[in-house]
Amino acid sequence: MDPAAGLTALAYASGVTVALMVAIYVCSHLLLRYGLVPLSAAFSFSGFNVPLFYLLILPGTVVHELSHVLACLMTGVHVRDVRLFSPQANGVVGWVTHDTADPLRRGLIALAPFLGGSVAIYALIRFVLPPTEVDPLTSQPVDLALGFKAAAATIVGIVRSSNLHEPKTWFGLYLLFSLGYAVAPSRQDLHHLVAGGLMVIGLIMSVIVIDGWFQLRLMQNGLINNAAANVAVALQHLNALLMLACAGIALGTAVIVPVAVLSYWLRRSLAAR
């Protein structure tokens, strides 16, 4: 048995987590820029339908900001001001201001929408859209490709079994699009995540160098590896949620972007006549 198995599992699970977060971030911004924005422009007589755009992003924005609030409460950071949905002229639609925190807690607060949005998408799929036998909270995907393939198959199966004649189905898809937009971090959140991530990487590299230089054999320590294995299991559950969220956002992007672009093109063509 590999004496560093726990740390190896943790390193792999962490890599999967980062890969999924990057994928969610990319899909979320594609959904916003090439889906929700063109769709709002297509159904407008004045260039851009602001009320429709706000309606599309409302649920997701509320979940995004609530995730920050809950993270502040759980980490003991005092919240100064909360606006769950308050569109401003500069493009900001919601915010949470809090006291200054250390890099670790600041990073956890910035990460909160990933978890909050993924949990919201999970709840949506379990309780609003047609039921599925796959439960991400009880699954532990080890392989990234197989895990994402299973999550995508779950989402596609749900859509295929949906009754498009029921308002509940369209309401569920609307929430899926909105939540997909809001799962990704904002620019300020991303700044905190990058700063915190670089600090963590620097700390890990320092420990590895010190361990190798002084032959401390920390990588083979049983207690450290057991703790790392437990953290890896927790990350695998998180990755299951992130995979489901990523698959849902990817599907939403694949559906709404062509519709939005086509609608916008038709509107421009009709307006030019």
Residue spans for each PLM region:
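Metalloprotease/metallohydrolase-associated module, dominated by Zn2+-dependent proteases
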Residues: 2-37, 89-270
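Active-site glycine/GP-rich loop and adjacent strand/helix microenvironment
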Residues: 273
